[in-house]
């Protein structure tokens, strides 16, 4: 089998998508020696694999650090089976993922659904200090007044963490309603 088929078969045969990570640590341990090539392959091919999502969460952001930006792409559609595991892994990456989040918000302006899922899947799980680092980016998102809900989510996160004053929240909210 090609290396690609090998990784796919190993994922399918080793990981049980019905079980939590804790329930299958021994099986997941078989991936402890995963190669960088295989990680790249995971990133490029396996967004539709629930097992891959479980593996990402198990491997954790430290091991996946050079490829975090690739796994951020799994959040372009939260209905993809691996998106949940990717978002939980990336939430824990904290500071490490902020430059990549910022890049997507600034450079990929037309993919507001992706912005929406990044906010919901990662940013809202950050602590206040990390969210404060993204304050300007979030305000910029609010001001874009998109139709996909990213602006509303950005405002909700700013408000919920008291990063902008109630007056500012109110003013932005009125702007969004207009």
Model regions and ranges:
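Alpha-solenoid helical repeat architecture
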Residues: 15-19, 41-46, 75-79, 90, ...
